[in-house]
Amino acid sequence: MKNIVLTGFMGSGKTTIGKLIAEKLDIELIDTDSEVIKEFGMTIDKIFEVHGEKKFREVETKVIERVSKLENVVISTGGGVVLNPENVKLLRENGVIYFLYAPAESILKRLKDDDTRPLLKNGDKLSNIIRLLNMRMPFYKNCDFEINTDILTPELAAEKIISIHLAKESKR
């Protein structure tokens, strides 16, 4: 089975939905942010502070190179992984990419008490979310499928992705 790759903005539900899919299909979940944290031995917040976003993205791509070679896994990516076309190419070689979408206001509600997001640290959170979401949307729209996590519970979103994925797999 091709990998199920979840991408989308921070707070869109990638980790939560990824866990549900992995559990239901009894396959492994790989969270690329967690893999980057292992590489550096520090939180993403700290990585950005000490090494900067550029270094974070370089290591993220190395993680993508490694995990994209796996088969039959769920891969939950960082929200900015789609900004690098090479990452998308690698993930698509052995996977189907699902964009988990939620509007800016919903993301703000989900992240309101989360101070660990380096890209939302300075200035007005909603303005930053809108700006980043608008900048990334053309990249997200290039994914294979879009799932609106604002109108679906995590359980229903997971079921929808599984249903789409298994139908797609049966046609291969």
Curated annotation (Swiss-Prot):
Transmembrane domains' residue ranges: none
A Gene Ontology molecular function term of the record: shikimate kinase activity
Keywords: Amino-acid biosynthesis, Aromatic amino acid biosynthesis, ATP-binding, Cytoplasm, Kinase, Magnesium, Metal-binding, Nucleotide-binding, Transferase
EC number from the UniProt entry: 2.7.1.71
Compartments where located: Cytoplasm
Cofactor(s) demanded: Mg(2+)
Residues that, per the record, bind substrate: D33, R57, G79, R136
Binding site for ATP: G11, S12, G13, K14, T15, T16, R117
Cofactor note: Binds 1 Mg(2+) ion per subunit.
The UniProt record lists the keyword Transmembrane: no
InterPro entries with a match to the protein in the record: P-loop_NTPase, Shikimate/glucono_kinase, Shikimate_kinase/TSH1, Shikimate_kinase_CS
Protein's job: Catalyzes the specific phosphorylation of the 3-hydroxyl group of shikimic acid using ATP as a cosubstrate.
Family: Belongs to the shikimate kinase family.
UniProt xrefs under PANTHER family: SHIKIMATE KINASE (PTHR21087), SHIKIMATE KINASE 1, CHLOROPLASTIC (PTHR21087:SF16)
Subunit structure comment from the entry: Monomer.
Protein name: Shikimate kinase
Originating organism: Caldicellulosiruptor bescii (strain ATCC BAA-1888 / DSM 6725 / KCTC 15123 / Z-1320)
Gene name of this polypeptide: aroK
